């Protein structure tokens, strides 16, 4: 029976070895699979970070486009308002010329002239409300940014380098010169 027991023991040992070997193989396979899972989790996190970065860049890009578009729209509005205001200036000049001429030919009291006076006054009031400033007042210091020098004259009533008279009014809008005032300035 010794031999039988030996063989049984050998079979048990062999069986146990096989089971151990299978366990080790299974543990190795599980370890490999766990490592693959960890690698996939890491890749997933990296991809999520990339996706988040891409989303943030897209949002930033959209904000930049929005901001640039708003700036362009504002610039266009400003340019068109400027262009419109510059086109109004000759109308003001014409109305003022008519009023000056009416005084010369003595028709200042005619109803049509009164209508022109009211029209000019209304137009200037509207422009004032919009922020347009009239430049070129008498006795103000000459400023080359808003005044165009027509000539210099001697004057006892006006201080040197001050405006004696205004040939044409100047206009500014939001610190933008629409037209410089044409002025005569007192000499030093």
Swiss-Prot record:
One GO CC term, this protein: cytosol
Gene Ontology MF term list: adenyl-nucleotide exchange factor activity; protein homodimerization activity; protein-folding chaperone binding; unfolded protein binding
Alphabetical keyword list: Chaperone, Cytoplasm, Stress response
Compartmental location: Cytoplasm
Main localization category: cytoplasm
Domain of life: Bacteria
GO biological process, one term: protein folding
Function: Participates actively in the response to hyperosmotic and heat shock by preventing the aggregation of stress-denatured proteins, in association with DnaK and GrpE. It is the nucleotide exchange factor for DnaK and may function as a thermosensor. Unfolded proteins bind initially to DnaJ; upon interaction with the DnaJ-bound protein, DnaK hydrolyzes its bound ATP, resulting in the formation of a stable complex. GrpE releases ADP from DnaK; ATP binding to DnaK triggers the release of the substrate protein, thus completing the reaction cycle.
Similarity comment text for this entry: Belongs to the GrpE family.
Subunit organization: Homodimer.
Protein name: Protein GrpE 2
